[in-house]
Amino acid sequence: MTDKFNEVVILAAVRTPIGTYNGSLKDIRADQLGSIVIKEVINRSNIDKEEIDEVIMGQILTAGMGQNPARQASINAGLSKSIPAYLVNQVCGSGLRSVISGYQTLLLGESKYVICGGQENMSLAPHVLNYKNEKKLSKEKLIDTMIYDGLIDAFNNYHMGVTAENV
């Protein structure tokens, strides 16, 4: 192990506008928002996109998004398919966790340039129906994935707003 860690700096910080539920961003998928941000990070940082070693994105609501939305965002931003990209889901801390993970890989010298952040669109979180066992639809309930996967504590069964007040 080395006695000296690498110096880590942020070359560019970018975000999309904060939208409202079913507002002006309601039809833009999370991976598309992520792709826009990745392109702008590369533009502002003045580094060649071929120098990017890794992309780490935080996202909670992935139902119906297809495999690895972080990779979708990365490739659609024009990055090489050879650049690894992965998704972090640590609920409300997902974007921050991606930055911490990026920091760690840079600190240890595993990468030179890492793009990390978060991507989400709560307006596009689908309602799902468990219909695999061929039950009658009249007995099934739709599940709002925005609420169930993103906003309800899995252990205490209450809204994350209550969790915030309890913390």
Model-inferred region functions:
Residues 2-8, 20-49, 66-67, 74-167:
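Acyl-thioester C-C bond-transforming condensing/cleaving domain
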Residues 14-18:
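Short polar catalytic/cofactor-binding loops
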Residues 51-58:
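Short glycine-rich phosphate-binding loop at a beta-alpha junction
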Residues 59-65:
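Glycine-rich phosphate-binding loops at beta-strand->alpha-helix junctions
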